[in-house]
């Protein structure tokens, strides 16, 4: 029995006949008929449209293909437009992937630019077109593809059509903006909208020498990601000199002789030379709607799994379509180039071979460069899951781009969202300076295959110190998520802690040095390595929240407490780093009067006069790259202890909070901040050693009004004395000092002559077991049956120490 295989390539239909004759197989080709030449018409020549046109030619050499584009350009790199405006991409021609002429010649396609389709007639299978001269004509089609893209949102505000107010969507917009900046010598710009395009434009206008103010109606930039992940971007923008107006709406614009004034709902007014509107986009559906095609719930063109619309033989791709989200099945709009190009290939095959290939949808994987930082996301963020009422849990881990001991390891923060029971991955967000893209790409692939957090633990990745760590940030994220699911690490988010802070006991498990640089208000400091010695001070009947810098020491402390019977204990997700960044207030932005971008160096040294002798001073250089907080600031302290007054330390670090910590440290210690700046994720600070605080009247006055809080946990004499020494030292600088005495520490306050009080049985038992007065305190080391403490008291009396 012959086997018949149908093949419809190259405009003919063949039968491949497999015959068996005398123990040999023969493949016979039998031509059955000649196929009718098909005519494909494509509306829109960018991304999805151009991709589909090229694929159509590759699979059907004889077809007639007509590509219609209302603008003068096709197949251009629209994602590169902001970088051409900023001068990062120097040559305009590099944006034009193909010209109409080269594309038409290579693929034998009839490309007609500046030909706009103004009507579709599905019953007649024709479209009406208006050319550049205004002449209208009709073209027939066998199958039609719509790739109209999306249109910028432009609200009907007073003055919005004034000269100098732009949107950016195509090459023509780019040319107008670039020419305007040059001709008008623009020095001040306002970007309205802080999405991907808005922030890319802010960076590139800054790169072109323009001071930029960003106005955003929401409470964060980059709406697709969660607030805690956007907060570091806020800080980075401010460090770069960008003025940031969050939770602000524009009421109207006014053109004046000096430029444009942007008026905000709060009453503020921002002067500018130009304005860029980046409020968002909407699917371009006017043609589809006029033709009677079905629109989806979110306003996009409805398509089925083969990308065919509600009308047979009419297909659609790109920004204009609406398609169910693969994770939820809910309607979804996706304004990204990668899905549009994938759709172009799929739809071409379906148009030629029949509806044989299904589109699985896009989960929304995106990335953006914001000055030195990279921010990327895939899948569903926590706020979207909450909005849709889906049960979820999240984790936040702070890692490094590669092994910390290899030079120039840069911070990298990863947030995962997942099902709290099954561990199914919902989404991921990542911010950092290097290696962000490859982590999100890996996770996106797992999410599309229905992966779980346990798959992250099993992910195999390349490893060498310059590229990653033996435990990659992806694996670390998986470990943490699995601990949360199993109950090994009960957690609390920064937002939950803000609401519950007064109801819990907060324990900072970092070192005393870290604690002194800043902590969550109300927290007590019990370092991880001393946790077991202070169990009696931690209540078992009150909720306890542990935290450290990034979460690891908090987790280890939690395991100690849970192993000792504590049940109502949780670890803060992301540690103090996430909490402090997410809750940090943004400074009130000041509108620029003119001039170029304000640098982070200028911003840092406004209150410090420029020192012409910087290069003449002895400077000790320290590289603290790769160290997490408080590593860099501890290196500063160590270096300052080794130099003389008037000498300087220059330290480079990759911890994002280092520059801020260094400023606070200088304010506290009386040292002088000379300079600070950042470049590509590396923060450089120059500090000059000042005179000791107690001998400098200026330093004393600078410290006045500040307070110091100490906590005495122990009744060991040496530790108590150390606390009092620190307290007296702080008081000597003019600071107000408060000492908290915990259970054991209260023994230090016991008097030799004390009043008689009534005690119950347990009170009497404790009285017998505890020191009767401060004279009975022992040393933590070298007690020698009480001789050690008596020797110390003798020396104190001899030296006149009370």
Regions found by a protein language model. Name each.
Residues 454-465, 469-495, 500-505, 512-545, ...:
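Rhodanese-like catalytic fold shared by cysteine-dependent sulfurtransferases
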Residues 161-185, 261-263, 268-349, 442, ...:
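FAD-site-proximal beta/loop scaffold in flavoenzymes
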